[in-house]
Amino acid sequence: MLEAYRQHVAERAALGVPPKPLDDAQTADLVELLKNPPAGEEAFLVDLLENRVPAGVDQAAYVKAAFLAALAKGEATSPLISKERAVYLLGTMLGGYNVAPLVALLDDAELAELAAEALKKTLLVFDAFHDVADKAKAGNANAQAVMQSWADAEWFTTRPDVPSEIKLTVFKVTGETNTDDLSPAQDAWSRPDIPLHANAMLKNERDGINPEVPGEVGPLNQIKELIAKGNQVAYVGDVVGTGSSRKSATNSVLWFFGDDIPHIPNKKDGGYCLGSKIAPIFFNTMEDAGALPIEIDVANMNMGDEIVLKIDHAAAKVTASKDGAVIAEAELKTPVLLDEARAGGRINLIVGRGLTTKAREALGLPVSTLFRVPVQPAATGKGFTQAQKMVGRACGLPEGQGVLPGTYCEPKMTTVGSQDTTGPMTRDELKDLACLGFSADLVMQSFCHTAAYPKPVDVQMQHSLPDFIMNRGGVSLRPGDGIIHSWLNRMLLPDTVGTGGDSHTRFPIGISFPAGSGLVAFAAATGVMPLDMPESVLVKFKGKMQPGITLRDLVHAIPYYAIQAGDLTVEKKGKKNIFSGRILEIDLTEMETDLTVEQAFELSDASAERSAAGCSITLSEEKVAEYLRSNITMLKWMISEGYGDARTMARRVENMEKWLANPSLLKADADAEYTKVYEIDLADIKEPVLCCPNDPDDAKLLSDVQGVKIDEVFVGSCMTNIGHFRATGKLLEKVPGGVLSTRLWIAPPTRMDEHQLMEEGFYNIYGKAGARTEMPGCSLCMGNQARVAPNTTCVSTSTRNFPNRLGQGANVYLASAELASVAAVLGKLPTPEEYQQYAAQIDSMSADIYQYLSFDKMGEYTDAAANVDTKKIAAAQLT
């Protein structure tokens, strides 16, 4: 074991990273060596046990905790670890498998006091709290000491406070840093391996950044030189963290600029992140990780500068100085940030505060005044928006009451989603949280990002992750099933709240607040999520859509109109974005056509590109009911196909049927207040709207970019549904000579869409035209597997067009499937007139083309569903 491990250490050292944490087999071997240590290896073996084994409910932690417990009880011995040291080490394991042994040791005359000291700093005790409380009531003095310590929040007060003044060295990245810059999609396979993945941070050349190996390894030496100055290094940028929700971006930043966590391998917390604008999901993820994110003007901060950051704790104000002169001032988003940073992160603070509250209640003490409390906004006397009412219901407020912007709350998480490039990190976070069962009503795991072209590490993950999720009561999809959102949307309950480890978790019914994997794990484990309620921006569409205009054009009209109003800028320095961090609420009541839920998702999905915190949409009860009837059949079909967890799906079916028995939807009050209201008359949108290379905010009319030569076209992603692929097929029938001059990629969102398109003959059309058909899933959209050729010009229906996302050096226009298909046929962006000639053919067949999958009307699914008794399954206990 030692020889193999040392070889692994050498291999990792060559990559400039520490070894991986020990797994359960290695830990078991280590235990045997510790019982009878080889001469000369003593210190090394102890270091491995103390510092290289994961905590929580990792299987290696189980082996470690069992060994330490056996040492403490005298059931095992080691010449290197005393009983006392074993108890201390149990106290470093955060929670989970270490808790029961420590609680039991409270009755041990020899070790009880040490066990109490260990428990005082342990937050993740969950139901074991009652065991300690019972011992305290029975007169156990050490249990009483633990309860008093928890009540006094010694877990918090013994940690160092955020310094009032600190000297920082600036690591400045100019312009916009998106999460793909910090955690490149092509390296998604390595995300759970935090140190190795961090090597790819900022690997692409850009102004002021000097990667070691451009396109492969980031600016490691540049970072080392700044660290060598002796100050803590702060990550600084004009616009920081836009794009995906991946916590791996935060992990990479903290790996270089954060603080070691004692006894926890390959993870860090703490650190400082300064940005003129910090994207909301990234901001939250930094909070969760124990960093201090500060929105402050960074115009006068440059790479390598030494600045002094002064933090007025009482006023929650920040001052940055350079060479003795003040260069920027700001207020913290909330004073609670200081408590979060001190606690080691927002999740630690929430869990710890809850533990302190429970202990004080048990001891008959008043509520603690130790922690900073968010200032709750005063009632306005006005009504509530749709989103505010949804969150209000999830917080248990009286029906019709909402949560005002600026309010701190913890809404119930009814639905939680996880996908396969964040799922392995979520699994690690769930282990750290000592989670053995989900409290959220439905947690779903997909395999849409890695199924098509998996690496060996992906295949291993695809084999191990489903059972991990299902064993905790979650629902697991299968590789090849398709995109997370296209499935998760079909499991939603109207007017409920949820989250997901993907920034496009944007519910078309209800509302979701996407998050990094740490917060997603917390939401899944506890069933609630912390939220500082955002303000809302309202977009009202009214009138009739013009010929040839698609929903994707309405999606792009939102940034287009905001640019015209001066509320959104494409320039990153001094960036303006009215949607950033706010809820985008979309009112469709004055549109002539009722949108289906599938259509509505195109609008809600793209709120991610606006950097909005969430999105809600007004839909008709009729369309929502149609959708739920279809989804009930789909869920029953899934149960018949052997998907798990069957009990969770059956329970969701029961709740859908309850809604259908008494349908109602929350609506905004007439006097609800919004930060801004945009009214978009559909009569004014007469030509397609695209987003230009390489920024999803850079919305322009087709006439502004017509004639651009196109090399490749992608029709796919969560922004598409079956209607888009039928439209593409109909347009491909018009290809001159029968074969495209462009390279066309086709990737349906789900295997049900693929199957139906094959049944209808569209795959024959795609093949004749020379299109490349991909496995249902994300395909090109994230750019982590298949990619377009370098330096090509493309049209894509995908979500984002950040630099290098779809392909190295690619210039990508975002457009509707209809416009993308015309570009594929013509090999260029058409003129508006050319486009309308093709679009007219689609409009004449629209009733047939834009038919969505109604599973309750499809025999293959209804026959299977008829044999599923969800009431019986939902009532059964988990086995």
Question: What positions do the PLM features span?
Answer:
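Short coil turns that connect the paired helices of HEAT/ARM alpha-solenoid repeats
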Residues: 36-40, 73-81, 105-112, 135-139
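Fe-S-dependent hydro-lyases/dehydratases of central metabolism
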Residues: 98, 114-879
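Short amphipathic alpha-helical segments that mediate assembly, nucleic-acid/protein binding
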Residues: 5, 27, 41-42, 64, ...
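Generic amphipathic, hydrophobic interface segment in small proteins and small subunits
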Residues: 31-48
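Amphipathic alpha-helical scaffolding segments comprising HEAT/armadillo-like alpha-solenoid repeats
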Residues: 24-32, 55-74, 93-106, 125-136
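Structural detector for internal amphipathic alpha-helices that build alpha-solenoid repeat scaffolds
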Residues: 15-20, 43-59, 73, 80-95, ...
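Amphipathic alpha-helical packing elements
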Residues: 2-31, 36, 337-350
